[in-house]
């Protein structure tokens, strides 16, 4: 084969360029790294047809080349863009631009930026990537949009365009261009041999410029360039780029790069109470561009890349021509390729993965040209080593920046946005950055200590990004910045809270982008799920009531995770969720072995596992919707609920501190002259300081927790959970029928108890603190769930869980929370509630007598108070009124309920009135100042402490007692018969008599206290209600029960009651007369009993009740063989359904009458009566 001459080689190379190549070699080549510019090319090109585009270098001479100073001069005002070029080499670029513009449409084509995603130049030293066919089609279609209407671009114009973009010249020196001396010498020597094609020329230009920059500072090639259109200089002026860069100041710094600046003041900063300046020092290391040779090179390459886009916008039709488009694409590729070389240290000194990347400040300051970072990813991701060497330092730099940023300013979002953009970069179906992030050693580090939750937050790669928080305990800077002013007004706090919630939303949206991209990427989906599951499992202790905060992730971190999971779960359809996932052998969530189940023991759970999976290997893999749903469910358990509990604890602490401060202030006159005055003043000062701190922390928590949109997302997710559980309870959902099947579904019984408890706790929280959130589409399902659970209490083993559901209903009662009246009406008017809700609540009222807890005796009063309040509201509803009446007349259940009412009223009134007596006693002592001052100091303090304790007890018990008496008053007005049963009537009469004696007896003055309304004590109202109950039950049987009470009843007591009612005007004259008639009737029975009194104390032992040691009148035999009096054992069974001697289960139906013994007793009594007379 005949050897080609140098001229023939040149012609064929130019012809190939003119043909508009669409593909590039895939063999990686390395840019020559040398001080001198590249010489003439050596390798020959394959022969190809010569096409005329006017790009023939044979016609080029130094005299006609467009490389003079004027040829690349920019106007100083040209920062908005660079004009197109004309074909005249003799005029300045300004004149040429005007000439060419007349023949080109100057419409801005927004899609021209898409051409920026080009292939990598062969001189970069980085392996080229095949362009996706879709990309090719897209580029062709974009080119077809605006067919060229002007003349084809000549080679001279193309050279002018290259020089303008790179701001270089190889003819004349000027302050606005970089003079390329080596290239100039080659053009003078032999212009035909300088470059083989434009890619070669671009490579030589860039290499010479960059190698020049590696020289000493005195020879900085960028020093003569003035700032024009580069993004770095304009970033600070852009409305959405409010960060200026700090490049330092030195004589060698090019004026084209921005000098020391400061962040603009955030709009949020002006709202802070302190009004302090931004903490620039905290972020300057990460947001400042270091002044060095590498950043000089990067600035130059970034600006060149940006000028390509400017040219495309200024002259879209010209740039759409294949040759120009390919040229601009090559320029972009070469800029990116040389950027990669700079970042690797190939042009200066090699860099390790531990060194921070020079590119991080540019990314944080949001001033890289559109498509720059994506093109860098595209160019490098096929070479794994190069890709890691460039992007691992970038990822580390972003994580460090995220770790040091805070919500005290809006800087926190920039690391998130930068990582989000990286992760969203996609080529085909692959997200290269997601692959790299998930392959990092710290993606999911192994736990090294018991505090695995806090470890994951601190050590895992994404931990730093998820850690931003508004809570004071997570980030003290937030409270200091926004809530530490001398006077924090309510309006100011509201505005700041809204702004903080907005910033939280922005940050969480970026977190969602990051995690969503990693999940979308098939290669990293498993890693993402494993990471989320690890966070959930590592923070299981966060659900504990007294969790050690040092061992678990912060509240802010967990709420951020929850927000992201909520977004991932938004479109999940329940039909795709497997309700048995929590039992699946491949379930990612690890529940503690002692996790309480709704209605099952661990043995039951293990049986269920065997039934589900014991004989069916291999198991079907859980689907993503199922895994995502349950991860979100458990994230709620570990984030929003612990945060709510902390919020409530803080409010309680604020109330207690307020009370302490008020007490100290109110009693200052007593201690200001005492030896303890200094101590009290110090305590007052400490309490005020602590109170101020807690109020500020609450303001932060308000912003983080009382976010309506976030709470609505939580409520809607719990609505999904409720739907899932209702489907398990009744597959016919939404057409649920009550009562449910007596056998509890095994899947439901084995579910963790907190699935139900969390719903109750969350509802309780929003009803109290954000009731407007309650009305969502899911509300109907929530109402149905409450009704179903309250009417089927046997489905829940833990009575305290049922009590929480009752408390939710109580809290929505209009008398408690007026803003939830609509919700309460939805419950009471629900079709499933009208027949079963009242009897179910009445049954629970009695069942709660025994809960199994050590505090059951005191707990029952609060629970019954809630039920009584609910009953009073339901009584007003016509639909429930009939159910009440049916229950009143049905017998056994209502009788037990009345028995508990009697028990509670007896205890609560007794305790309340006794505490009032003690309060009266101490108050009387303190009134006698002389006597009080004589008491020793420690005795005074003990008495004051007892007074405070009695005041708390009195307030609490009187509130409960008042509600119980109200219920008694209501019931006795409607129905009387059950109250007169033998096992109830005497006890009720004795209770009423005793309390009348307390209110009107000889010692009633002991109940007189200062400010009785402070304790909720209304003696007139109480007396009125008690005497009303007497009148409502007025009959011969009740009068006999009153007369039989020998402990409290007396004629004088009733006379005193009548006198007080008349004197205080408590009742009408008619009512008083009725009460007087009842008193006379009772007195007649007392006199009759006295005349017929017979002493039965010598009755034989077999006639005596073994429990009460009284004469039996209706003996019955228990299953154990013991014989008791029927009235006594029935009274016992009302309190406890057990045999009093062996604690075995016992019901009334198990009692066996003993007629023979009864006859013997009656015969003995007749004999006794006849002998006495």
UniProtKB/Swiss-Prot annotation:
<keyword id="KW-0007">Acetylation</keyword>
<feature type="modified residue" description="Phosphoserine">
    <location>
        <position position="105"/>
    </location>
</feature>
<dbReference type="GO" id="GO:0009411">
    <property type="term" value="P:response to UV"/>
</dbReference>
<dbReference type="InterPro" id="IPR019474">
    <property type="entry name" value="Ub_conjug_fac_E4_core"/>
</dbReference>
<feature type="region of interest" description="Disordered">
    <location>
        <begin position="928"/>
        <end position="948"/>
    </location>
</feature>
<feature type="compositionally biased region" description="Basic and acidic residues">
    <location>
        <begin position="134"/>
        <end position="147"/>
    </location>
</feature>
<feature type="compositionally biased region" description="Polar residues">
    <location>
        <begin position="51"/>
        <end position="64"/>
    </location>
</feature>
<dbReference type="GO" id="GO:0051865">
    <property type="term" value="P:protein autoubiquitination"/>
</dbReference>
<feature type="modified residue" description="Phosphoserine">
    <location>
        <position position="88"/>
    </location>
</feature>
<feature type="site" description="Cleavage; by caspase-3 and caspase-7">
    <location>
        <begin position="109"/>
        <end position="110"/>
    </location>
</feature>
<dbReference type="GO" id="GO:0051082">
    <property type="term" value="F:unfolded protein binding"/>
</dbReference>
<feature type="modified residue" description="Phosphoserine">
    <location>
        <position position="840"/>
    </location>
</feature>
<dbReference type="Pfam" id="PF10408">
    <property type="entry name" value="Ufd2P_core"/>
</dbReference>
<feature type="compositionally biased region" description="Low complexity">
    <location>
        <begin position="937"/>
        <end position="948"/>
    </location>
</feature>
<dbReference type="GO" id="GO:0016567">
    <property type="term" value="P:protein ubiquitination"/>
</dbReference>
<dbReference type="GO" id="GO:0019899">
    <property type="term" value="F:enzyme binding"/>
</dbReference>
<feature type="modified residue" description="Phosphoserine">
    <location>
        <position position="674"/>
    </location>
</feature>
<dbReference type="Pfam" id="PF04564">
    <property type="entry name" value="U-box"/>
</dbReference>
<dbReference type="GO" id="GO:0030163">
    <property type="term" value="P:protein catabolic process"/>
</dbReference>
<feature type="compositionally biased region" description="Low complexity">
    <location>
        <begin position="16"/>
        <end position="33"/>
    </location>
</feature>
<feature type="modified residue" description="Phosphoserine">
    <location>
        <position position="90"/>
    </location>
</feature>
<dbReference type="GO" id="GO:0034450">
    <property type="term" value="F:ubiquitin-ubiquitin ligase activity"/>
</dbReference>
<dbReference type="GO" id="GO:0036503">
    <property type="term" value="P:ERAD pathway"/>
</dbReference>
<comment type="subunit">
    <text>Interacts with VCP. Interacts with STUB1/CHIP and UNC45B.</text>
</comment>
<keyword id="KW-0963">Cytoplasm</keyword>
<feature type="region of interest" description="Disordered">
    <location>
        <begin position="1"/>
        <end position="155"/>
    </location>
</feature>
<dbReference type="GO" id="GO:0005524">
    <property type="term" value="F:ATP binding"/>
</dbReference>
<dbReference type="GO" id="GO:0005634">
    <property type="term" value="C:nucleus"/>
</dbReference>
<keyword id="KW-0539">Nucleus</keyword>
<dbReference type="InterPro" id="IPR013083">
    <property type="entry name" value="Znf_RING/FYVE/PHD"/>
</dbReference>
<dbReference type="GO" id="GO:0006513">
    <property type="term" value="P:protein monoubiquitination"/>
</dbReference>
<keyword id="KW-0597">Phosphoprotein</keyword>
<keyword id="KW-0808">Transferase</keyword>
<dbReference type="GO" id="GO:0003222">
    <property type="term" value="P:ventricular trabecula myocardium morphogenesis"/>
</dbReference>
<feature type="site" description="Cleavage; by caspase-6 and granzyme B">
    <location>
        <begin position="123"/>
        <end position="124"/>
    </location>
</feature>
<dbReference type="InterPro" id="IPR045132">
    <property type="entry name" value="UBE4"/>
</dbReference>
<dbReference type="GO" id="GO:0006457">
    <property type="term" value="P:protein folding"/>
</dbReference>
<protein>
    <recommendedName>
        <fullName>Ubiquitin conjugation factor E4 B</fullName>
        <ecNumber>2.3.2.27</ecNumber>
    </recommendedName>
</protein>
<feature type="modified residue" description="N-acetylmethionine">
    <location>
        <position position="1"/>
    </location>
</feature>
<dbReference type="GO" id="GO:0000209">
    <property type="term" value="P:protein polyubiquitination"/>
</dbReference>
<feature type="modified residue" description="Phosphoserine">
    <location>
        <position position="238"/>
    </location>
</feature>
<dbReference type="GO" id="GO:0006511">
    <property type="term" value="P:ubiquitin-dependent protein catabolic process"/>
</dbReference>
């Amino acid at each position: 084969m005949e050897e080609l001459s140098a001229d023939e080689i040149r012609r064929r190379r130019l012809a190939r360029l003119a043909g508009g190549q669409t593909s590039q070699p895939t063999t990686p080549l390395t840019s020559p790294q040398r001080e001198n510019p590249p010489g003439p090319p050596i390798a020959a090109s394959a022969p190809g047809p010569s096409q005329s585009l006017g790009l023939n270098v044979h016609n080029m001479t130094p005299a006609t080349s467009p490389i003079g100073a004027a040829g690349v001069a920019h106007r100083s005002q040209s920062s908005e863009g660079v004009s197109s070029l004309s074909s005249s080499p003799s005029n300045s670029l300004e004149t040429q631009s005007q000439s060419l513009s007349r023949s080109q449409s100057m419409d801005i084509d927004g899609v021209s930026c898409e051409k920026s995603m080009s292939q990598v130049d062969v001189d970069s030293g980085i392996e080229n990537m095949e362009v996706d066919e879709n990309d090719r089609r897209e580029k062709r279609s974009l080119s077809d949009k605006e067919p060229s209407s002007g003349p084809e671009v000549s080679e001279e114009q193309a050279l002018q365009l290259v020089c303008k973009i790179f701001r270089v010249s190889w003819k004349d020196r000027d302050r606005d261009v970089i003079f390329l001396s080596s290239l100039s010498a080659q053009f003078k020597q032999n212009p035909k041999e300088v470059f083989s094609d434009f890619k070669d020329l671009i490579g030589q230009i860039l290499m010479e410029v960059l190698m020049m920059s590696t020289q000493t500072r005195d020879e900085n090639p960028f020093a003569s360039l003035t700032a024009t259109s580069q993004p770095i200089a304009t970033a600070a002026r852009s409305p959405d780029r409010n960060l200026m860069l700090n490049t330092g100041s030195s004589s060698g710094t090019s004026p084209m790069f921005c000098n020391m600046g400061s962040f603009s003041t955030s709009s949020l900063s002006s709202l802070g109470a302190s009004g302090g300046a931004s903490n620039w020092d905290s972020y300057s290391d990460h947001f400042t561009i270091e002044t060095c040779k590498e950043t000089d090179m990067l600035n130059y390459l970034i600006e060149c890349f940006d000028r390509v886009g400017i040219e495309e916008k200024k002259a879209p039709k010209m740039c759409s021509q294949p040759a120009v488009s390919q040229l601009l694409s090559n320029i972009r590729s070469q800029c990116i390729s040389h950027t990669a070389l700079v970042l690797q240290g190939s042009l200066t000194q090699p860099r390790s993965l531990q060194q921070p990347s020079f590119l991080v400040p540019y990314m944080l300051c949001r001033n890289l040209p559109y498509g720059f970072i994506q093109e860098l990813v595209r160019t490098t991701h096929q070479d794994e080593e190069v890709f890691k060497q460039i992007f691992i330092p970038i990822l580390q730099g972003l994580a460090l920046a995220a770790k040091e940023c805070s919500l005290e300013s809006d800087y926190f979002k920039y690391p998130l946005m930068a990582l989000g953009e990286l992760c969203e970069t996609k080529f085909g179906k692959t997200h290269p950055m997601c692959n790299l992030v998930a392959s990092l050693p710290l993606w999911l580090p192994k736990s090294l200590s018991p505090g695995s939750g806090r470890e994951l937050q601190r050590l895992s790669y994404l931990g730093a990004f998820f850690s931003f928080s508004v809570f004071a305990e997570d980030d003290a800077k937030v409270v200091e910045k926004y809530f530490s002013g001398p006077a924090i007004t309510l309006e100011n706090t509201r505005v700041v809270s809204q702004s903080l919630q907005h910033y939280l939303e922005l940050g969480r949206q970026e977190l969602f982008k990051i995690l969503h991209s990693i999940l979308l990427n098939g290669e990293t989906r498993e890693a993402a799920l494993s990471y989320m599951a690890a966070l959930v499992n590592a923070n299981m202790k966060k659900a504990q009531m007294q969790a050690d905060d040092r061992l678990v992730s912060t509240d802010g971190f967990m709420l951020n995770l929850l927000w992201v999971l909520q977004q991932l779960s938004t479109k999940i359809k329940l039909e795709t969720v497997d309700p048995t996932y929590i039992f699946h052998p491949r379930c990612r969530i690890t529940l503690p072995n002692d996790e309480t189940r709704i209605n099952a023991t661990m043995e039951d759970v293990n049986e269920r596992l065997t039934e589900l999976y014991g004989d069916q290997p291999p198991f079907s893999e859980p689907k993503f919707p199922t895994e995502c749903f349950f991860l979100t469910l458990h994230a709620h358990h570990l984030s929003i609920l612990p945060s709510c509990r902390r919020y409530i604890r803080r409010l309680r602490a604020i109330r207690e501190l307020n009370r302490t401060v008020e007490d100290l202030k109110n009693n200052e006159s007593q201690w200001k002259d005492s030896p303890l005055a200094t101590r009290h003043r110090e305590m007052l000062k400490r309490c005020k300081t602590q109170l101020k701190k807690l109020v500020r922390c609450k303001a932060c928590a308000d912003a983080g927790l009382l976010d309506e949109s976030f709470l609505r997302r939580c409520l809607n997710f719990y609505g999904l959970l409720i739907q899932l559980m209702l489907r398990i309870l009744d597959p016919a959902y939404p057409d649920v029928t009550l009562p449910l099947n007596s056998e509890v579904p095994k899947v439901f019984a084995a579910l963790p108890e907190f699935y139900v408890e969390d719903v109750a706790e969350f509802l309780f929280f929003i009803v109290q603190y954000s009731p407007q959130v309650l009305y969502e589409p899911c509300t109907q399902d929530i109402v149905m769930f409450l009704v179903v659970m309250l009417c089927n209490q046997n489905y829940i083993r833990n009575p305290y869980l049922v009590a929480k559901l009752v408390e939710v209903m109580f809290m929505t009662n209009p008398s408690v929370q007026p803003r939830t009246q609509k919700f309460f009406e939805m419950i009471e008017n629900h079709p499933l509630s009208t027949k079963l809700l009242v009897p179910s609540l009445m049954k629970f009222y009695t069942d709660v007598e025994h809960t199994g807890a050590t505090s059951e005796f005191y707990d029952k009063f609060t629970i019954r108070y809630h039920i009584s309040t609910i009953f009073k509201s339901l009584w007003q509803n016509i639909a429930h009124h009939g159910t009440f009446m049916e229950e009143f007349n049905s017998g056994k259940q209502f009788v037990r309920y009345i028995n508990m009412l009697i028990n509670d009223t007896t205890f609560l009134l007794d305790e309340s009135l006794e505490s009032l007596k003690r309060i009266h006693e101490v108050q009387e002592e303190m009134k006698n100042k002389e006597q009080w001052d004589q008491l020793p100091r420690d005795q005074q303090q003990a008495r004051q402490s007892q007074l405070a304790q009695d005041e708390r007890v009195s307030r609490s018990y009187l509130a409960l007692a008042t509600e119980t008496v109200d219920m008694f008053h209501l019931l006795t007005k409607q129905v009387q018969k059950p109250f007169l049963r033998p096992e109830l009537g005497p006890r009720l009469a004795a209770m009423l008599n005793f309390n009348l004696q307390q209110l009107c007896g000889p010692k009633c003055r002991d109940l007189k206290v200062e400010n009785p309304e402070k304790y909720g004590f209304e003696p007139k109202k109480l007396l009125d209600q008690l005497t009303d109950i007497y009148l409502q039950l007025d009959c011969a049987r009740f009068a006999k029960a009153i007369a039989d009470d020998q402990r409290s009843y007396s004629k004088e007591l009733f006379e005193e009651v009548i006198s007080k009612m008349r004197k205080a005007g408590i009742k009408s004259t008619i009512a008083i007369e009725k009460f007087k008639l009842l008193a006379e009737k009772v007195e007649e029975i007392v006199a009759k009993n006295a005349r017929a009194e017979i002493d039965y104390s010598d009755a034989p032992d077999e006639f005596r009740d073994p429990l009460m040691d009284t004469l039996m009148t209706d003996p019955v035999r228990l299953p154990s063989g013991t014989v008791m009096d029927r009235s006594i054992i029935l009274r016992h069974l009302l309190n406890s359904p057990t045999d009093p001697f062996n604690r075995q289960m016992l019901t009334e139906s198990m009692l066996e009458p003993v007629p023979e013994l009864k006859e013997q007793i009656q015969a003995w009594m007749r004999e006794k009566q006849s002998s006495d007379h």
